[in-house]
Structures are given as C-alpha cells and as structure tokens.
C-alpha cells in the first residue's frame, strides 16, 4: 500500500454522532476526543514528481470549474489530480443530499493507489451554524482513516459582510470549529494552512478568481515544500 503524504482540510458535512473506540473517543457526541496517544511521524517534504496521484476532497473552492487552483497545480507539479470536491457541502451536512458530504466521500474512497490527499473547507459548516462537536467527530473519523498519512489543513477566510454567502454564522461557532480543526490536526501530526493568512482575489466575494486560484495554488505548493 502506497504511503499518502498530504491532506488539506475542508468543512463538509454529514450527521455523524456515533461512538467509535477507533477514534480514541470517550463521548458519543465528540468533545472528549482528546486523548493524545498517537505516535505519527513528523511532516515530510512534498516532492515535485510527475504523475504522482493526488485526490482532492472539499467544497466549491475546489469543485470542478472553468478555472480552479487545481488546473494550475497540475501544470506546475505534473501531478495527476482526482477531484472529488462537491459544491455546497460540509462535514456533517449537505443541503441537497445528506449522503454527499466530505466525511462520507473520504470514508468511502479507496486511497490505496493515491500518493497524496488534499482536503479543503471551513465555510459551509460555519455558515449554517453546524454543531462544532459533531463536526469534530466527523473530521476525526476522516483523520483516523488517513492517520498514517500527512495532512495540510486549509481553513478559508470567513467573510461576514457578504449578503449572499457567509452571513448566517456567529463568531463563537467559527472559532470553535477552527480550534477543533487545529487540535485534531495537531493530534494526528498533520500540518495546518490557514488561507486567511494570504490574500486571495475573489470573483464573487467568496470563490477565488482566476488570479486568486493562482495565488492559492502557489501558496499550497509553498506550504507543502516547507517541511
């Protein structure tokens, strides 16, 4: 089985409230998943090798479009990207189809022949005020599946002043979800990228423009090569 070396986090959803001893959990609803008895390797460098297979999970930031960061990523790295991102999704919900969530997509995917995994997200679960504890359980289930792999978590900037996008959320929920992502990634030895740390031009106030996609691509590659 090939070793996966990367993942980028996304908030995509499905109501997962079941207990799991595999997750080191003491609580069915999630907030006590805090036992850190993992022993995973430190970060490893991303090698720019052509024909490496990368699978991408996430929401509309990565979903197929006329232009996305993925197009540039393939051109610059020579990697083969398998895109499994779904629009309007989150870890514990999807407004139109509850089976199409990032969590379920990750858990159902065969990663045996994949070299790297990238997961995006952060906006949808926050936007719809999903319960942080449930998102934490769902995300940790994803982490557990790829626990021997490397993860880079991208938490997109939340934009509270947009009329049509991220308006329906409160700061406390956003902070809890972000902290849970950081904590889970730290527990599993994954790397975090916070997209709010660099300026991404947006075509509609939320989704990256052509220029924004290039910036995102470059920042992802840069982050992968840092360690």
Named regions from a protein language model:
Residues 134-137, 141-145, 176-183:
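Alpha-helical scaffolding segments of alpha/beta enzyme cores, especially the outer helices
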Residues 159-196, 210, 219-222:
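Substrate-gating cap/lid alpha-helix
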Residues 1-57, 61-66, 74-76, 107-115, ...:
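N-terminal secretory targeting modules
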Residues 47, 51-56, 61-137, 172-175, ...:
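Conserved SGNH/GDSL esterase-like catalytic core that processes O-acyl groups on lipids
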Residues 54, 81-83, 151, 189-194:
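Conserved beta-strand scaffold positions in the cores of enzyme catalytic domains, especially
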Residues 120-124, 145-174, 196-199:
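Active-site segments of SGNH/GDSL-like serine hydrolases
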Residues 84-86, 195-200:
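Short glycine-rich catalytic loops that host catalytic nucleophiles or stabilize transition states
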């Amino acid at each position: 089985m090939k070793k996966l070396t990367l993942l980028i986090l996304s908030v995509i959803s499905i109501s997962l409230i079941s207990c799991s001893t595999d997750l080191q959990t003491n609580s069915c609803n999630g907030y006590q998943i805090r036992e850190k008895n993992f022993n995973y390797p430190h970060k490893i460098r991303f090698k720019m090798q052509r024909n490496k297979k990368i699978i991408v999970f996430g929401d509309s930031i990565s979903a197929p479009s006329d232009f996305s960061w993925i197009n540039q990523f393939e051109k610059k790295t020579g990697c083969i990207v398998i895109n499994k991102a779904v629009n309007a999704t989150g870890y514990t919900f999807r407004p139109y189809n509850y089976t199409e969530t990032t969590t379920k997509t990750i858990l159902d995917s065969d990663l045996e022949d994949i070299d790297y995994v990238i997961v995006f997200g952060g906006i949808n679960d926050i936007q719809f005020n999903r319960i942080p504890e449930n998102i934490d359980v769902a995300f940790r289930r994803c982490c557990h599946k790829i626990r021997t792999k490397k993860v880079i978590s991208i938490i997109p900037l939340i934009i509270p002043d947009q009329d049509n996008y991220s308006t329906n959320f409160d700061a406390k929920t956003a902070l809890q979800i972000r902290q849970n992502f950081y904590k889970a990634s730290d527990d599993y030895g994954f790397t975090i990228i916070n997209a709010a740390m660099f300026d991404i031009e947006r075509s509609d106030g939320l989704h990256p423009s052509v220029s924004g996609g290039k910036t995102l691509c470059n920042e992802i590659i840069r982050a992968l090569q840092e360690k």
